[in-house]
A protein has these predicted regions:
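N-terminal secretory signal peptides that target proteins for export/translocation
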Residues: 1-12
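Bacterial N-terminal signal peptides
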Residues: 11-26
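Short, glycine-/small- and polar/acidic-enriched structural segments
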Residues: 31-167, 171-175, 182-189, 199-204, ...
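Predominant activation on well-ordered alpha-helical scaffold segments within soluble catalytic domains
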Residues: 49, 95, 152, 192, ...
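Pocket-lining segment of extracytoplasmic ligand-binding domains
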Residues: 92, 125, 170-261
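Secondary-structure end/capping motifs
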Residues: 226-305
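Conserved C-terminal helix/tail region of periplasmic/extracytoplasmic solute-binding proteins
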Residues: 295-325
Length: 325
């Protein structure tokens, strides 16, 4: 009887120890990390979504939910409202949010420059150079956007004035095809697809010429920065580890990217992979100069001169990206 009691006691102790061991892990896994994106098809975001497909977040003990919003502004609104913990956004817009009292910081670079961006015109357009667009209509997604900034920069470089027409991302290509605008400036997927299909040609490879303005960056809420630093660091580590995997495994990445980016040809998929992936930050490191350049340009493009006075080094931290000690 005494032996049986000892066995029961030992079993109870073992179960108790197992429970004590399991509880902290369960608590750590219970908190969901919500990561928001401007869309669910940009090649810039593919590593995060690939990590989800590969089960890498779960393997790291993280409960991550990826959310594709309708535009970066919607993602920012979600973070402001506490409906997202991390978002992918662009530097000047982060500064604008912070200037309005939102508590957030940039934590890891996705793409500092504008790789894949092009200024395109219809194939039958008489425009052969930027000078030919003087006084013409250029389609952009929205005001206070990256395309808005790019259009201003292009005009300044060419010494011309163009009329910017905010169309929404979904209307850019239809408006160009119907000649409602003379040109558009936008990111890789839309512009490359039109060029490869022979419906448009590029007057400027924006990605190769425009200076880095912190075009795409992970941004974390104050709660993540202060109260969930370990989870933030772990989530970013998974994303950048997946990026390294995708860079080292072209065949798998091409197959995944074709479906993710809704690419309609192997040629377009290859253009996205070869044109963008080598430029994606391998470790998330942030440079103050990238942010400062974006603030200066946005202050003019958006007619918000206060942005030029914001101290770039107050908007980010390199404490959490995978290369940080």
């Amino acid at each position: 009887m005494r032996k049986m009691s000892i066995l029961h006691a030992a079993g109870a102790l073992a179960r108790a120890m197992l429970l004590v061991t399991w509880l902290p892990l369960a608590a750590a896994q219970a908190a969901e990390i919500r990561i928001g994106f401007a869309n669910g098809s940009s090649a810039d975001y593919a590593p995060a979504f690939a990590a989800e497909k590969l089960g890498s977040f779960k393997q790291a003990g993280l409960d991550v939910r990826l959310i594709a919003f309708r535009g970066g502004a919607a993602a920012q609104e979600a973070l402001t409202a506490g409906a997202a913990d991390i978002i992918a956004y662009f530097g000047p817009a982060v500064a604008l949010a912070v200037s309005k009292g939102v508590k957030e910081k940039m934590v890891a670079t996705i793409l500092a420059g504008h790789s894949g961006w092009n200024l395109i015109v219809p194939t039958d357009s008489p425009a052969r150079s930027l000078k030919d667009l003087a006084g013409k209509k250029i389609g952009i997604s929205t005001k206070a956007s990256t395309s808005d900034m790019a259009a201003l920069w292009i005009g300044e470089q060419a010494g011309i004035s163009m009329t910017q027409i905010p169309l929404g991302a979904g209307a850019l290509i239809p408006s160009l095809r119907s000649h409602q605008v003379d040109a558009i400036v936008f990111s890789a997927l839309l512009t490359m697809r039109e060029m490869l299909a022979g419906r448009a040609r590029s007057l400027m490879d924006v990605g190769a010429t425009m200076p880095a303005t912190m075009a795409n960056v992970y941004v974390a809420s104050e709660d993540m920065l202060v109260n969930r630093a370990g989870e933030l660091r772990a989530a970013l580590a998974v994303i950048y580890k997946t990026l390294a995997y995708m860079k080292a495994n072209r065949a798998w990445s091409m197959s995944y990217l074709k479906d993710f980016a809704k690419s309609d040809s192997d040629e377009l998929t290859a253009a996205l992979y070869d044109g963008i992936f080598p430029k994606l930050s391998p470790d998330g490191h942030i440079e103050t100069a990238w942010i400062a350049e974006g603030l200066t340009l946005a202050a003019r493009a958006w007619e918000v001169p206060e942005l030029a006075k914001v101290k770039a080094d107050t908007l980010y931290t390199n404490e959490f990206h995978p290369a940080a000690p």
